[in-house]
Curated annotation (Swiss-Prot):
This is Nuclear pore membrane glycoprotein 210-like. InterPro entries: Big_2, Ig_NUP210_4th, Ig_NUP210_6th, Ig_NUP210_9th, Invasin/intimin_cell_adhesion, NUP210-like, NUP210_Ig1, NUP210_Ig15. SMART domains: BID_2 (SM00635). It is found in: Nucleus membrane. It holds the Pfam family Ig_NUP210_4th. Glycans are attached at N84, N304, N348, N495, N522, N812, N931, N1445, N1859. Belongs to the NUP210 family. Residues 1-35 form the signal peptide.
Amino acid sequence: MTGCPASSRRRGFGLFFFLRLHRLLLLFLVLRGTLANKLNVPQVLLPFGREPGRVPFLLEAQRGCYTWHSTHHDAVTVEPLYENGTLCSQKAVLIAESTQPIRLSSIILAREIVTDHELRCDVKVDVINSIEIVSRARELYVDDSPLELMVRALDAEGNTFSSLAGMMFEWSIAQDNESAREELSSKIRILKYSEAEYAPPIYIAEMEKEEKQGDVILVSGIRTGAAVVKVRIHEPFYKKVAAALIRLLVLENIFLIPSHDIYLLVGTYIKYQVAKMVQGRVTEVKFPLEHYILELQDHRVALNGSHSEKVAILDDKTAMVTASQLGQTNLVFVHKNVHMRSVSGLPNCTIYVVEPGFLGFTVQPGNRWSLEVGQVYVITVDVFDKSSTKVYISDNLRITYDFPKEYFEEQLTTVNGSYHIVKALKDGVVVINASLTSIIYQNKDIQPIKFLIKHQQEVKIYFPIMLTPKFLAFPHHPMGMLYRYKVQVEGGSGNFTWTSSNETVVIVTTKGVVTAGQVRGNSTVLARDVQNPFRYGEIKIHVLKLNKMELLPFHADVEIGQIIEIPIAMYHINKETKEAMAFTDCSHLSLDLNMDKQGVFTLLKEGIQRPGPMHCSSTHIAAKSLGHTLVTVSVNECDKYLESSATFAAYEPLKALNPVEVALVTWQSVKEMVFEGGPRPWILEPSRFFLELNAEKTEKIGIAQVWLPSKRKQNQYIYRIQCLDLGEQVLTFRIGNHPGVLNPSPAVEVLQVRFICAHPASMSVTPVYKVPAGAQPCPLPQHNKWLIPVSRLRDTVLELAVFDQHRRKFDNFSSLMLEWKSSNETLAHFEDYKSVEMVAKDDGSGQTRLHGHQILKVHQIKGTVLIGVNFVGYSEKKSPKEISNLPRSVDVELLLVDDVTVVPENATIYNHPDVKETFSLVEGSGYFLVNSSEQGVVTITYMEAESSVELVPLHPGFFTLEVYDLCLAFLGPATAHLRVSDIQELELDLIDKVEIDKTVLVTVRVLGSSKRPFQNKYFRNMELKLQLASAIVTLTPMEQQDEYSENYILRATTIGQTTLVAIAKDKMGRKYTSTPRHIEVFPPFRLLPEKMTLIPMNMMQVMSEGGPQPQSIVHFSISNQTVAVVNRRGQVTGKIVGTAVVHGTIQTVNEDTGKVIVFSQDEVQIEVVQLRAVRILAAATRLITATKMPVYVMGVTSTQTPFSFSNANPGLTFHWSMSKRDVLDLVPRHSEVFLQLPVEHNFAMVVHTKAAGRTSIKVTVHCMNSSSGQFEGNLLELSDEVQILVFEKLQLFYPECQPEQILMPINSQLKLHTNREGAAFVSSRVLKCFPNSSVIEEDGEGLLKAGSIAGTAVLEVTSIEPFGVNQTTITGVQVAPVTYLRVSSQPKLYTAQGRTLSAFPLGMSLTFTVQFYNSIGEKFHTHNTQLYLALNRDDLLHIGPGNKNYTYMAQAVNRGLTLVGLWDRRHPGMADYIPVAVEHAIEPDTKLTFVGDIICFSTHLVSQHGEPGIWMISANNILQTDIVTGVGVARSPGTAMIFHDIPGVVKTYREVVVNASSRLMLSYDLKTYLTNTLNSTVFKLFITTGRNGVNLKGFCTPNQALAITKVLLPATLMLCHVQFSNTLLDIPASKVFQVHSDFSMEKGVYVCIIKVRPQSEELLQALSVADTSVYGWATLVSERSKNGMQRILIPFIPAFYINQSELVLSHKQDIGEIRVLGVDRVLRKLEVISSSPVLVVAGHSHSPLTPGLAIYSVRVVNFTSFQQMASPVFINISCVLTSQSEAVVVRAMKDKLGADHCEDSAILKRFTGSYQILLLTLFAVLASTASIFLAYNAFLNKIQTVPVVYVPTLGTPQPGFFNSTSSPPHFMSLQPPLAQSRLQHWLWSIRH
C-alpha cells in the first residue's frame, strides 16, 4: 500500500511527535558522543598467492561515512564500497597484492568525513606454512544433514589467516588405516553446495560454477563407519605444504523417544522407542536393533534400598524399563561393534525412581481455570515427587477423578486417568477432584498407594465472548474527523480489558468505543476476559486506502418532484486477491455530484447522510425536468480521485435481427421477422407504449405479430410475414411511446427491411457433415461432386437448398412439393419420399434460412446409389402460371462405406528414439484429419498413400490418437488410446522357496506407467537381463510364451539364500532394477518319526523338520481313516489294527493368482498294533548302593516305546511291586518334586538302591476297557519281572578320608580346576594308564581328554607355591562307556499338610536335568552324549534347551499329559521316558461364571516354609480380586486370568470366563410383608444372577469372607428399586422406603434391604387408605438396560393414621370422637384401650361416605373424678399387623359458655384457613339447593382415588372463612349429633 503524500503525513503526525521531539534530539546527541566508531577487526592476516583471484577481505565500520587509505599499496590495496548509489562508504575490500613470498605489512586508515575521526587496521601478508581442517563435529549421520568442513591456514608462527576466500583447494577422500580396505567413497561423499539445501558463501557459489573447490565444502554420510577427508592447496607454489587430514565417523542418526530424563514411581514402567532420522524423516526402528543394544548402567540405589537389586529392569525385546526400587540409573546405547563403542554421540538418558509427593491439575489451552462454554479443553492430572519434579505417568498408574457430568462432557479419557479431553457444557462454578490410588504391576498385581494423594481444583465456566459486528472498515482520512464506533460484547465474565494491536491505527476505550481513520493500517481489537486473558473476543478493524466506489442498485426513472436516494458503497481492493472490502462508515468524506445534462436532476441538501446497513454513505437527487442524464458521484481524498455514474431512462438501439436486410421466400411461404431494441414502455405511463410494422403493398403479404409465452429477450418483437403474391416491397417498423403529461417528448425509432417473394431457379443436395472444430471442410465435393462417400452403418441426413435466378438462397421454400428417389433401394431408401423437414441455419450474419432435410435409410451394405430430388409444384392448388420453366430435378451419386478404424486401438509404446510404431487406418472416406490429444508426446506422420500413421515417441505421456473422417457424418473421431512410457518397474514372478534339485518358472515383465506391461519386442532396446547374487541356483532361458514377458527355468543346486534381480536401461542410460526377490533353497522337508507304532486309542503327534524357514503351515491327511485319524496339528490317533500313511504338505496361496502352491511334502508310515506282551527295560541289573536308575515299560519290539501306548484313552494302568523292600525303593517319576502320579501315568519308575541284596521288580499293566482291543487276545492284563542285584561300592577302611576318582565317558573332555589357581603355579600330568596310554591324555594345563578305549589312569596335580612349598595330590581317572541316563525334575513343589499333587500346575516352569551313569550306577562327572528330545505332542508343553548343558526348560501351557523321551542319537536304546501331566492347581471350577458371582479361590500349593503365595488378576475390571485372600467378584463380562505366584517355586493360573447375566432371579420370605410404619422390621428381597441358584463359588475362609464385606463390596454391583403397583397413587415409593443392596454370605445371594423412611403427616394420611402392593426389582450396574427385567410383587399393609394428639372434653360435652384412617384388614386388628377406667371407649363405627374411616366414641364416666386426676389419661391405639402404637391425650376443660361451640368453630376455622379455595367453592354451592350439593359431592368421590383427609388439631384457633355474623351451613353445624355433622365437614377435601 502507498499512503498519502509526505506533506499530509507530516501534518497528520506532527502533532503526535511535537511534544517529544526535543527529548529525542537530546538522546541522539548523548548517544552520538558515547557510542564510539569501530572497525570489525583490529588486525588482518592475508595469504600470499601468485595465481589470479587473490583472497579478498571485507573491512567494516559501524557508523558514519569513511575514506580509505593503504600505507603500502604494493602489499595491500583497499577498494571502498558505496551503498545504494551514494558517496557514503562504511565497507571496503582488502586484497593482498604482494609479489614476494615474504612477510609484508600495511596499515589501513579509515577517516570519517564528518568528524575527521580516524580508525586504523593492521594488515599483514605472509606465506601459508600449514593448513588444517576445522569442523564443528567429527561425527555425521547417514542420509542426514551434511557436515561443513573448513580449511584454516597458519603461518610459520602459528597465526591463523583471516580469510582464504577465493583460494582453490583439492578435497579428496583418503584411505583410513584403522578400518578395513574398502572403496574410498563407501562411507562418505563430498557434496557441492548446489547439490544440498544450504546457501553457501557467494565466492563458493561462483567457484562451484567454474568446477573449482574452495576452502569450505560439505560432506555427507553414506553408511556407518570411519572415513578420512584430505585437502591440499591447489596453487603450485604451495605444493610442499602438507595436506590436512580429518577422520570422520559416520553414524546412524538414532535417538530415543523420549530422550529426556524420566522420573518414575516404583512399579511403573515406560516403553522407549528407537527412531532414526533418514533424509529428514523420522523412521521407527524395530527391535532387536541391528547395530546397538540397550543397557541400564550405573544403578544408584537410594538410601535404605536393596543394593543387591537393580533400580530398574530393562526388557531387551520391547525396550520397556520397569522401576523396581528408589534410586537412579542410566539407559544407554552400546554399539555391537567393539571398534565403534568409543562413539560419544549415542543417545542416553537418566531414569530416576522416586516417591509420589502431590498431584496437580493443568488445563490447556490457557492454563487458567476460567473456561468457556462449548470449548474443548485438555485437563491433565500431573504427579510430582516431593521435590516438585513431574513424574512420568505410565499406563499402569491409576488415578481416579471426578468431573461433574452436568458441567463437563468427557470426550476422551486415558486408562490411567491422567489425560482428559472434556467439553465445557454450562456456565457456573464447579470443583473437580483427582486421587492417585494404585499401581498395577505387570503380573496384574494391584499395589495401592501407601498414602492416598488427593487434589481438587475450582473451575469457573463462562459463555463465549462474542463481539459484533464481525469487522469494521474505515477509509483512510488523515485530515478529516475520526470515525467512532461502539463495539457490542456478549458472554464472558463481564469484566474485560480492551486492547488494540496497533494503537497508531485504532484506539479503543475501556468501554469498547473504537476511534480510527487518520492512520492507515490494520488492527485487531481484543476484549480479553480479566479472569482468563486467553479467552477473548476479537474484531478486525481496517483503515484502508479508498480504491473503488459504486452506486448501489436504485430506481433510474422518476416523476418530476420525486427524490431518489442513491446509496453509495466504497471499497478497498486488495491488489493480490482482487477482493473488495466494503467500508462500514465513510460519511465524513466530501462527495461531488455532477450531471452531463444540467437541469434534468438536481442535488438535494448537499446529499450526505449517515451510513446504513448496506452502504457507508448516501446522496439524494430530485427530478426537475424530463430527459436522460448521466449522474456522476465522485470523491477526491488523499490525492485519489474516484467516481461512479448511473444513467437514467436509456434504451438500446433498434435493429433488425432476422432478416438483416432482405428476406427471400417462395410463393405461400412464411418468414419470421425479428426486431430488437428501441424505447421501452415508460414506467410511469406504460399504456402509451406502441410498436407497428407497415407494408407498402398490403394486399401481397399477410402480417401477424407473434406473441410468445416466454420470449428470449423482453425487447424482441416477432412478426410472421406470408407471401400472397410474387414481388418485392419495403416493410417499415416503428417503436416508441406516445407523448404524455409526464413524458412529453418520447423517442420513436424507425427501421426498414426488404421482403421478396419469387420462384426457385435451382437446387443442390449435399450430405450434412458435422465438421470438427478447426478442421477443413470435406474436400470431396470440390473435386468429384458426383461420387460422395457416406456411411453404410448410419442413416445419412441429406440437405436440400433452393436458389433464385440470382443465385440467392431462399429463407423459406416450405410451400414447394418435392419427391425423393433412390436408384437402389436394397442399399438405401427414403421412408417418406415426399416429405422434407425444414431446418433453420444461421449464415453467420445472424439471419436464419430454412433448409430441407431428408433422412436416407441405409441397409449396412457397401455400394453406390444415385439419389434424385424432383420438383413437382406448389402445395397450394392455385399456383402461379410461370412455373413451367422452373427446374424439375437434381441428382447426386453416393458411395456407401464403413467408418474409419485405427489398428491397433490400444498400445503402450516404449519411449526410445529407435522405436517406430505404425498404425493402419482402415475403411472411411479416405480423407482424414489426424490429431493428438496431447502435443509433444510423439511425432505423428500421416502417410496418405499407405493410409497409415507412423509414431515416434518423444516424451512419456498418455494421449489419444484422433482420426477425423472429413467426408462422413461426424459422430466423433476414430480413436486409439496410446501411452508413451518410460520404464517404471521391472517385475519378477516366481516361487521364491525352492527345494534343492527342483526347478521353478521365472517370468520377467517390464511395466510402464499405470502398471501396463511392455511388449517383449522392446526388451532389446532396454538391454534387459537377469542377475543372481550367488550361484546356488542356475537360470536357463525358455521360448516365448506370450508377447509381454520372457521366461526362464530356475534350478536349485545348493542350499542357501540368494537374490534375483532384473536390470534394464532406458534411452538416457539410467539403470532400472526390479525389487530383489529373495530365493530360499531349502533342505528336503521331513516328517518325524518316519514310522509310528500305536495301539488303538493312543495318540501321538507327527513332528516336522526341514522345509522353508520360517516353516509354513503343514497340512496333514491320512490314507486310511478307519485305521487312524489325524487332525490339523498332526496328532494321529489309532483306531483299529492296520497300517496307514500320513501325508504332510507345506503350501501357501499366491497373493496374485490365488492358487495353492505346494513347496514340499513327506509322509509317515502308521502301524496300529495290539500289545502282545510288555517288558521292563532296566539298563543295568547290577547296581551299587545309593544310586538311581530309571525303569520303564516297553512292548515286545523296540518300536513299541511308551509313546505307543502311554497316552491312550481309555488308558492303561501300571502297577509295580518288589519282592524285597529293604534292598531298594521303587518310586514314581517326579517324586523328587513331591508329585504323586496316578497309576495311569506310572509306565516309568525310578529305582533307588539302599542295601546290598537281590530283589525282583514286577509290573502289571491293566487294560481299563476290554472292548478297545488294546491287548492281543482281548487280555485284560500283561506283566513282566526283572531281577536286580545291589552290591556295596569298594571302600577303604583306613585312612578315614576316602579317595575319590574321576569318572569320564569315552571320547570326552574335562577341564580340571583347583583352589590354588592364580595364587600358585599349578601343573598336572598322567602318571600311568591302563591298558595303554590312549586311555587319557593331559595337556599340562588341566585339560583331560578321554580316548576311545575304556580303562584307568593315575593323575598327579602339583602346586608350586611362591613361598617355597610344593603340594602334590594324586587321584584316579576312570574312562568307561555310558550305560544309561536319567531325567530328574525341578523345582520342588510343596503343598499344605495332608494335600498332594498328581500333576504339575498349569503355567508352571519346569527344569529337566539329564544325568549319565555307567554299568553299575556310578554318575559321570562329564558328558559327551548327543541327546535327542522327543514329545508325543507339542501343544501342552513348551520345552527347549536350558542355560546349562544337559538341561531343558519347559513351560506347562495347557492341561493334559505329555510324554517326554530322551535318548542318545548314536545309541537309541539308551533312553529315558517321563510323563508330564498338567492340571489346574487353583480351585474351584469356574465354568458357568456369571456377572455378580463371588469366587473364593484356593490352592494346595505353599512355599517351602508352608506360606501361601500371592494372588494376581489380569483384568481387575472383569474379575475384581483381593490379592491377599484370593477372592474375586465378577463385575463385567469377559475373560480374566487368576494367577497364584509362590516366588522362586511356581506360578500357576486359571482362566475365568465371565458370562453376562441373562436375567436376575428374585425371591423373598413369604411370611413377610411391607408396611410403612417407622421402625418396622427390615424387609429382605433376595437376588441371584446366572443359572446356578447362588452367587458364591468355592469354600470361603474367614479372611475371604471379611475381604468380601470390607474390600470387594459386591453389593455395589446391584441397584435395587421399588415402586407402588397402583399407578393412580401419585406417591413415589422412594419417599416411603429407603432401599440399598447387600450380599448375604450365609445364603450366598444378593439382598435388597428395604427400610421405612420418616414420612410427613400428609404422606401417612394418603397411604393409610391406599390399596396397593409394591413392585421390587433389581438391576446390575454394568447392565443398565431393562431388557429381561423381572419384577416381583410384594404385599404392602399401610399403617393406620390418626391426626389427633389430644381430645378435650367438658362437663356439658362429655362425649368425644377419635377418627382413624386405615384399610379394612388394619382396622379389623385395631385395639383401642383407655389407660383409666374414668374413660370408656365404645366400639367403632364406619363412615358411610368415606371408606376406611373408623370412628371411636370416648365417654367420661365421672367428670369430676376425671377433672381432679393428677396424671394425664390416654387412649392407646395399636395394631399387630403394622406394629403401631399411638396414644391420644384426653384432658378436661372448665365449663364456659359456648366452649363447645368455640372448639368446633376453631376446628372449622383451621380447616377453612387451610383450604380457602375449596371453601369459596363450597360457599357458592351452599347458595344452591341441597340436591346440587349431593350431586357435586358424588362427582368428587368419583374423581378421587386416594382421599387426602385434613384433620385439624384441636385447641389451636385459626382464622376462619366465616365471620361472626355468618351462620355455617347445616351440614357443618356444631350442634349434635356429632357423628353426623362433624364427619361431613371433616371429610370434605380435594385431590392434591
